[in-house]
């Protein structure tokens, strides 16, 4: 076993993720594929988890996911929607009712930072639904060390390629759904750069590709692909919509209607169904 570990360690020097160097003469992989390296950030589709923090593995009630943030990262999730609150003076992740589950924001961001340090060929995105001050978000990003990996994009400019982001080691996109602050150029206002589908669907028949928030001319497109019950997340609802052909057909329909690649494909219970097959299909056209 020792020899195998040594072999893996030897590849780290290439600056790619695990397995870099396998292709004809040592090309670096970007988010798992050499094919993505020269695509701009907005030319790739990323598997995303809705309410990523709310998960059964960590004991949350009414969770949106089965597994926690570290497990999600290891499975290949490359975007997370995270809700931030001030709970009695502590900055935490929770979903509406912090009594159902909460966690210090800095702890979760530190886990993300550690994973990205260990996987230098990976680009990752966060979309904050923030109910805290921008300065409080910034403090947690700084304390976790994630600040060193952030990228600040200028609206209207072309997005860099994954290779450029990886070589500069600015591999973390931090977006939020409310305006940012000139003091924190890396804390990007999502709706300056992106648009989305609606997200309040009770049944599969309700699904729509209509523009909701954001400008459909914006370069990034968020596909909300989850059903909501009055109580929140439901693995039974995920079972209904997370499988192909329904899932891929909706993604392709929205790509066609919106004339835009779904960049962030957001689901509940990512481990149920075909999320990774869908993003792979979108990325292989």
PLM regions and their residue ranges:
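Ser/Thr-rich, Pro/Gly/Ala-heavy low-complexity intrinsically disordered linkers and tails
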Residues: 1-27
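Catalytic cores of phosphodiester-bond hydrolases, prominently lipid phosphodiesterases
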Residues: 27-285
